[in-house]
Design a protein with these regions (language model features):
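A detector for small-residue-rich transmembrane helices and their helix-helix packing motifs
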Residues: 1-200
Length: 200
């Protein structure tokens, strides 16, 4: 089976995220929590009490400032390009959104457990899902896909988690949740294309 040569969805997601950010920057201040809640950021009381479940999706497309946006878009471009090219656009999108929503649900569960009422937004949960999916893909392809190696992906996972847990204001529950959701979704969707060759 030929792998897809197109990475249209990765490019589209980057354009959409950047477009939404610059539109909101024109309308107000994306670094203001109240403003971001108005436009779809995740806030536990509005989901638990007002059943505004759409926020589990809308918050994936929102970012608190240009640095937050650019960091996520660089990672989305690098990881998405490799993953979408390998598994195809449909499975890529499925992993992206399952990971993003799953990450937000796990973040909400942690908020409920800790009583934290933080406003959260960003594509990082979905992007960690791509990282988890790529980890499974390289495992299935005997340690390498394109220029990516299993060691490289594992190092990226550990480094990303380290920076998350040693920084403030980071939704680590969403990151870990996205990573797990992406890995498990990839296990279900991707069965590998490389098999050991038999000598004749």
């Amino acid at each position: 089976m030929q792998k897809s040569k197109q990475t249209v969805c990765t490019a589209a997601l980057i354009v959409i995220n950047m477009g939404i950010f610059f539109l909101l920057s024109f309308l107000g201040n994306p670094e203001n929590a109240v403003f971001m809640i108005k436009y779809g950021a995740m806030y536990p009381p509005l989901i638990f009490e007002d059943t505004q479940y759409y926020r589990l999706i809308t918050c994936i497309f929102l970012h608190f400032g240009i640095d937050h946006l650019m960091n996520n878009m660089v990672m989305l471009g690098a990881l998405g390009w490799n993953l979408e090219k390998e598994i195809g656009s449909f499975k890529f999108l499925l992993i992206y959104f399952v990971s993003g929503i799953g990450a937000n649900l796990i973040s909400l569960a942690m908020d409920f457990y800790t009583g934290n009422l933080a406003v959260s937004a960003g594509a990082s949960g979905a992007i960690f899902g791509l990282l988890g999916a790529l980890l499974w893909v390289v495992i299935r392809n005997r340690g390498k896909v394109g220029r990516l190696t299993g060691r490289g992906i594992l190092f990226m996972v550990l480094l990303s988690l380290y920076f998350g847990f040693t920084s403030t204001g980071v939704d680590n529950a969403a990151h870990v949740g996205g990573l797990i959701c992406g890995f498990l979704t990839a296990v279900l969707l991707y069965h590998g294309r490389n098999v050991p060759r038999q000598e004749v």
